[in-house]
Amino acid sequence: MKKQRNLRSMAAQAVEQVVEQGQSLSNILPPLQQKVSDKDKALLQELCFGVLRTLSQLDWLINKLMARPMTGKQRTVHYLIMVGLYQLLYTRIPPHAALAETVEGAIAIKRPQLKGLINGVLRQFQRQQEELLAKFNASDARYLHPSWLLKRLQKAYPEQWQSIVEANNQRPPMWLRVNRTHHSRDSWLALLDEAGMKGFPHADYPDAVRLETPAPVHALPGFEDGWVTVQDASAQGCMTWLAPQNSEHILDLCAAPGGKTTHILEVAPEAQVVAVDIDEQRLSRVYDNLKRLGMKATVKQGDGRYPSQWCGEQQFDRILLDAPCSATGVIRHHPDIKWLRRDRDIPELAQLQSEILDAIWPHLKSGGTLVYATCSVLPEENSLQIKAFLQRTADAELCETGAPEQPGKQNLPGAEEGDGFFYAKLIKK
């Protein structure tokens, strides 16, 4: 039996590592969840994700409730108070239980002398809640986004930025990809129905199903046998443009964690697929995905800027470049992105994308297809990137996705739809 741990202190320390040390929640959270009971895993995730989703609101409230911010070794207490405020604002946990557990968290982080302070701040919030929230709702902090990102969204989407921000602040729907080599989408939906769950097919992406209510993967019919994969609808859209065929040589560049690699093999089981990623650690997830789905691909560690180091002079019929990007289209899945990214990252990422595009283009056969994709909504990484590439690359031609003056297809995050995603389909003349 797992030792009873204080979830509030664990969540506070995880959020602190994201905000203060720049660590990714997807790296921090799984090892923490291994330390708690199954019934507590979901609550720990809810507290971490929720605090990061609403961080600017919680920060704003603490600044109003406390005369001085917590600094130095007491900084974790700042995040513990955030966890307390989040529970009072957004969960069904009874207030007395939320307060008691949060105050007890001070012992777990070895700050028992601050129990009174934590209790006092949270009770003060309860007394002033209505007045404080009225002021908060009139402030810029209400958008729950850093100011640099708000400015970029307002500039790029003067008519739509508010709906993008609103979608980013929602919990995401759970999209699945039915493995067409095992079942048709309709037959798998029937199995889902038999299991007491409801799903909805996507109108445009033939393998995509949205669950009415998110569910743990082990509850999904045939998950362990590779019948279905968790993948956002917009990510599945890459296959519409790539259109892989059997017997072709296909490169999936920046492939980890392998969702698109396995989708290529579901669409074209006899394709010769090479999956490459710079991050050796994340490549283990590509192997895991291939194993669960019973598929084979050549998996290599390599830098997209130097393809000759990992593929020599080899050329491919099709290349999927899911380029490293700001991930500003998937904030609802990864709310830590808002606080990990900086404005200065955007030109640096655009430069990296440009270098990879130029380096990999010679490895595409004449007449071949390259699909450039990002999970970003920022033009610098998307339409402007492809426009510049077309201008400097004489044998590149835009196909089916936009027009040369506004190249590519941009999906924006939507409440029941997929994430923010960009695609450009290029043909080598």
UniProtKB/Swiss-Prot annotation:
Subcellular location: Cytoplasm
Catalytic reactions on record: cytidine(967) in 16S rRNA + S-adenosyl-L-methionine = 5-methylcytidine(967) in 16S rRNA + S-adenosyl-L-homocysteine + H(+)
Enzyme class (EC, first level): transferase
Location of the active site: 375
Signal peptide annotation: none
Function noted in UniProt: Specifically methylates the cytosine at position 967 (m5C967) of 16S rRNA.
Protein name, as recorded: Ribosomal RNA small subunit methyltransferase B
Organism of derivation: Shigella boydii serotype 18 (strain CDC 3083-94 / BS512)
Organism phylogeny: Bacteria, Pseudomonadati, Pseudomonadota, Gammaproteobacteria, Enterobacterales
Gene from which the chain derives: rsmB
